[in-house]
C-alpha cells in the first residue's frame, strides 16, 4: 500500500511539474500573440485618422523624436566613449595590434551586437518607462475612455506617434552610441597600443557593408517596435494610479528581454 501511495504521489508531482513547465513555455507565445494583436490595432488606427489629425500626428511624432533622440544624443555619445574606453582595455591586455583585427572586433562585438542592446536598454529605461507612466496616468484618469466615447481612436492618438518616434529615434541613438564607442576605443588604443587614430577609424569605416548595416537597422527597428508595444500595452491595462508603479518593472523587464531575443534571432540570421 505504501508503495502504491508513493507512486501516486510521484505521478501527481510529475504531472503537476509538466503542467507548470507547459504553462511557462506557453507564456512567451501568448505574449507574442498579444503584441501582434496590439500592433494590428495600432496600424489599423492609422487608417482611421482623418485629414485634420495628420498635422497633430506629425507634430507629436517630431516631439517624441526630440525628447527621445535629440535631447539624449550628448548622453549617448559620452556613455559610448566610456564604454569604448573600457572595451579597449582587454584588447590592450591581450596585445592585439593588428588594425584589421581590431576593426573586425568592433564590427562583430560592438556595432552589430552590444551597442544595439545597450541602446535598447537605455531607451527602455529612460523613454520607455516614461511612456508607460504617462499613458498609465492618462488611462487612470479615464481620458482614454473619454476620447473613445468622442469617436477618437486612442491607439492612433497616443500610441502611433510614439511608435513612429521610437522607430526613428532608436537607430539615431544607436548611431550616436557607435560614434562614442569608436572614439573612446580609438583614444585608448592610440595611447596604449600606438594604433594611429586615422588608421583605426579607417578600418572601422571600411568594414561596414550595406547588407550588414541593413540587417542591423532592421534589428534596431524591430526592437523599437517591441519596446513601444510592450510599454503602451502595459499602460493601457492600468485601472488606477496604484497600478502604475506595479506596471513599470514588468514592462521594463519584458521589453529588455524581448530586445535580447530579437538580437539573438538576428544574430542567428547573420552568422548562422
Language-model regions: role of each:
Residues 66-118, 122:
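Active-site cofactor/substrate anionic-group-binding motifs, chiefly glycine-
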Residues 69, 73, 77, 158-180, ...:
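Selective transmembrane-helix segments that form parts of the transport pathway or gating/packing helices
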Residues 135-160, 244:
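Short cytoplasmic-facing helical segments at TM-TM junctions of multi-pass membrane proteins
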Residues 7-60:
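Short, membrane-interfacial amphipathic segments enriched in basic
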Residues 121-139:
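A hydrophobic alpha-helix feature that marks transmembrane segments and, especially
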Residues 90-114, 176-221, 229-250, 270-272:
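Membrane-interfacial helix-loop-helix connectors in multipass membrane proteins
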Residues 51-62, 66-78, 256-257:
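Membrane-interface helix starts
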Residues 244, 250-268:
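Final/C-terminal transmembrane alpha-helix of multipass membrane proteins
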Amino acid at each position: 500500500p505504501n508503495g502504491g501511495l508513493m507512486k501516486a504521489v510521484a505521478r501527481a508531482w510529475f504531472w503537476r511539474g509538466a503542467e507548470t513547465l507547459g504553462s511557462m513555455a506557453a507564456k512567451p507565445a501568448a505574449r507574442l500573440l498579444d503584441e501582434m494583436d496590439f500592433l494590428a490595432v495600432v496600424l489599423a488606427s492609422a487608417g482611421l485618422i482623418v485629414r485634420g489629425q495628420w498635422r497633430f500626428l506629425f507634430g507629436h511624432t517630431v516631439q517624441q523624436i526630440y525628447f527621445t533622440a535629440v535631447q539624449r544624443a550628448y548622453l549617448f555619445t559620452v556613455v559610448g566613449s566610456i564604454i569604448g574606453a573600457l572595451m579597449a582595455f582587454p584588447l590592450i591586455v591581450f596585445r592585439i595590434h593588428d588594425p584589421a583585427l581590431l576593426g573586425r572586433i568592433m564590427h562583430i562585438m560592438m556595432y552589430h551586437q552590444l551597442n544595439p542592446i545597450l541602446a535598447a536598454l537605455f531607451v527602455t529605461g529612460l523613454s520607455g518607462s516614461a511612456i508607460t507612466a504617462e499613458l498609465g496616468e492618462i488611462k487612470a484618469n479615464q481620458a482614454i475612455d473619454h476620447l473613445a466615447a468622442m469617436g477618437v481612436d486612442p491607439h492612433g492618438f497616443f500610441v502611433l506617434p510614439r511608435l513612429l518616434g521610437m522607430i526613428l529615434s532608436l537607430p539615431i541613438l544607436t548611431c550616436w552610441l557607435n560614434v562614442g564607442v569608436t572614439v573612446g576605443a580609438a583614444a585608448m588604443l592610440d595611447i596604449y597600443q600606438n594604433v594611429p587614430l586615422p588608421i583605426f577609424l579607417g578600418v572601422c569605416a571600411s568594414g561596414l557593408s550595406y547588407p550588414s548595416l541593413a540587417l542591423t537597422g532592421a534589428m534596431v527597428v524591430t526592437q523599437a517596435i517591441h519596446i513601444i508595444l510592450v510599454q503602451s500595452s502595459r499602460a493601457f491595462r492600468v485601472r488606477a494610479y496604484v497600478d502604475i508603479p506595479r506596471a513599470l518593472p514588468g514592462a521594463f523587464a519584458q521589453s529588455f528581454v524581448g530586445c535580447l531575443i530579437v538580437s539573438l534571432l538576428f544574430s542567428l540570421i547573420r552568422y548562422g
